C-alpha cells in the first residue's frame, strides 16, 4: 500500500502536481503488488525488478498553458530495505503490527520533482525568472487496515530552490474484482507552506507588469480525489491506470499566473515484473 509519494514530479509543471503523480505512479505500482501473494520470510529478502512505460496527460494551472502530454519510463526495484519507483526512493524503516488486520509502516523518502517553469512556457510568464524543480526529502507513515488505509508524508526542498515544505495526507480503500483487477478510490490533501507557494506562484517586484501585479504567496491546502486501477494478466504483466482531480487552494487561484480553479490528470501505463 502506498498512499503518498512525491511528487510527481516527473515533468516541469507546478508543485501542485507532486501529490498527484505520486498517486498515479507509485500508488499504481504498489496496488499491482497487492495482487500477488504475500511474500514469506525468504521471499521478502529478495529483490524484485520491474520495467515499463506509461503516458500521462495533465492540465496545468498556469494561464496560457494547455495539457501536458508526455511519456513516462517506469523502473521499479523493491526489497525489504528499499522501494524505488519512478522519481522516488523509499528507505524502509521497521514496521509495527498493531493487530492481525492493522499495521503501521514507516519510511524515509527522497524524490525528484520537475515542477517549475521557464518564461517561454506561456505569455503570462514572459519576463519571469525561471522556477526550478529539484529534490525533496522527508518521512512517511502509512496505517493499513481491512477497512481503509491512511498515509501521511512530510517533505522538504533539499535542493534549496523554494526552501519550502509540504505535508500530504490521504485515505484510500482497495476493492478486489476477481484475481486480476484492483480498483482504488482515494482522497487526500496537500499542504504547502508560504515559501513553496510564493516560489511557484508568486510575482516578485522586479517581475511586475501591467497585467501581472506583485503577488506574495501564502501557505495553502489543495484537495485531491481520484481513482486508480490495476489489471494483472499474470505475475509479470500489469496494466496501470488512474484519474485524479485537484481543487486548487484560494492562495494559488488568486495568483495572477493562474487562470483555473482545478487541475486534472489521466495516466495509463504498462509494467513488466521480472
Regions picked out by a protein language model, each given a short descriptive name:
Residues 1-46, 64:
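Cleavable N-terminal export/targeting peptides
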Residues 36-84, 88-92:
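Short glycine/proline- and aromatic-enriched beta-strand/turn motifs that initiate or cap beta-hairpins
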Residues 51-57, 77, 86-88, 108-112, ...:
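Transmembrane beta-barrel strands of outer-membrane/channel proteins
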Residues 54-56, 76-78, 97, 140-144, ...:
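Transmembrane beta-barrel domains of outer membrane proteins
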